[in-house]
Amino acid sequence: MNLNATILGQAIAFVLFVWFCMKYVWPPIMAAIEKRQGEIADGLASAERAKKDLDLAQANATDQLKTAKAEAQVIIEQANKRKAQIMDEAKAEAEQERNKIVAQAQAEIEAERKRAREELRKQVAMLAIAGAEKIIERSVDEAANSDIVDKLVAEL
């Protein structure tokens, strides 16, 4: 094979071309590729962090919902207990009021009964005196009459 100056020139030109590419062309290309790889890695890491944050937020939301439900249940139970307490107090108060009204009514009935008995005794005494006056057919003075009425009332 015949090595002549052309092949030697081409070899030198090729070596210079490779050196030029390695020195001036290759570094910006590699820098752009590395920059892009870094951006992609950052994007993936950010997506992974966002996914973890979402999972954490969902877990927190679930925990808060459970806590809120438990608190709501406690509040409902307290409200039911308070309702029962109020109902019991109202029943007791109504029972006391009923007993008071019944006692008052019984006292009024007893007072009315005594008054009616007293009135009846007086009327019976008056009728007895009137009957006695008619039977005896004489007049009795007023002082003696009231004394007789009082004695009859006491006896009845």
From Swiss-Prot:
It holds the Pfam family ATP-synt_B. It is found in: Cell inner membrane. Gene3D superfamilies: F1F0 ATP synthase subunit B, membrane domain. The keyword Metal-binding does not apply. The chain crosses the membrane at residues 11-31. One of its GO terms (cellular component) is plasma membrane. It comes from the Bacteria. One of its GO terms (molecular function) is proton-transporting ATPase activity, rotational mechanism. Signal peptide: none annotated. Keywords: ATP synthesis, Cell inner membrane, Cell membrane, CF(0), Hydrogen ion transport, Ion transport, Membrane, Transmembrane, Transmembrane helix, Transport. It is a single-pass membrane protein. Belongs to the ATPase B chain family. F-type ATPases have 2 components, F(1) - the catalytic core - and F(0) - the membrane proton channel. F(1) has five subunits: alpha(3), beta(3), gamma(1), delta(1), epsilon(1). F(0) has three main subunits: a(1), b(2) and c(10-14). The alpha and beta chains form an alternating ring which encloses part of the gamma chain. F(1) is attached to F(0) by a central stalk formed by the gamma and epsilon chains, while a peripheral stalk is formed by the delta and b chains. F(1)F(0) ATP synthase produces ATP from ADP in the presence of a proton or sodium gradient. F-type ATPases consist of two structural domains, F(1) containing the extramembraneous catalytic core and F(0) containing the membrane proton channel, linked together by a central stalk and a peripheral stalk. During catalysis, ATP synthesis in the catalytic domain of F(1) is coupled via a rotary mechanism of the central stalk subunits to proton translocation. Component of the F(0) channel, it forms part of the peripheral stalk, linking F(1) to F(0). This is ATP synthase subunit b. The gene is atpF.
